[in-house]
From Swiss-Prot:
It comes from Korarchaeum cryptofilum (strain OPF8). The keyword Secreted does not apply. Homodimer. Its cofactor is Mg(2+); Mn(2+). GO terms for biological process: nucleotide metabolic process; thiamine metabolic process. This is Probable inosine/xanthosine triphosphatase. It comes from the Archaea. Its EC number is 3.6.1.73. Gene3D superfamilies: 3.90.950.10. NCBIfam families: inosine/xanthosine triphosphatase (TIGR00258). InterPro entries: ITPase-like_fam (IPR029001), Non_canon_purine_NTPase (IPR002786), NTPase/PRRC1 (IPR026533), YjjX_NTPase (IPR050299). Binds 1 divalent metal cation per subunit; can use either Mg(2+) or Mn(2+).
Length: 172
């Protein structure tokens, strides 16, 4: 089974590999595709970006599954949260979605993010690690490594895989 991830970010590719390998033998490959949304998407744009990444990756590699993971900012209950939205699409067009765990977005970052700055860029400046979004991520920095970005995205991928894992158990 070939699984195409709509990103070459090693964190996203590894998260998908971890999730799929719990249930299937899969050849997980990252591919650079367009998301069609701003670099730091808010709300529905993150969902759209994940969908676009999954579909573009599926086509690019003629894979069995396409997976799009789009980190974004979501506004709920008067606060902004960072989370990853995951869209998984099978080659027959059946899709499923999931989300990673959420954490509150630092208020000090919001003015820059609302102007289009990416969380990863702000975290690079704060942490001194230019590759933070390709490594531990903001959550790894803030939790001192207790939770890493790959953990969040693995969780989100598993949530999106539930429909496919359940197979005959999934209600119709």
């Amino acid at each position: 089974m070939i699984v195409a991830v709509g990103s070459t970010n090693p964190v996203k590719v590894e998260a998908v590999r971890r999730a799929f390998s719990l249930f299937w033998e899969a050849d997980v490959r990252g591919v650079d595709v367009e998301s069609g949304v701003p670099k730091e998407p808010f709300g529905p744009n993150a969902i759209e970006g994940a969908r676009n990444r999954a579909r573009n990756a599926l086509r690019a590699l003629n894979a069995d599954f396409g997976v799009g993971i789009e980190g974004g900012i979501f506004h709920l209950f008067g606060k902004y949260y960072c989370a990853g939205f995951v869209w998984i699409e099978r080659k027959d067009g059946v899709h499923s979605t999931g989300m990673s765990g959420w954490f509150e977005c630092p208020e000090a970052f919001l003015p820059d993010m609302l102007r289009g700055r990416e969380l990863g860029d702000l975290m690079a400046r704060l942490s001194g690690n230019e590759n933070i979004k390709r490594e531990e991520g903001a959550i790894g920095f803030f939790t001192r490594g207790a939770v890493k970005r790959v953990d969040l995205y693995t969780h989100g991928t598993l949530m999106a895989l539930a429909k496919f894992i359940a197979a005959g158990r999934w209600p119709r």
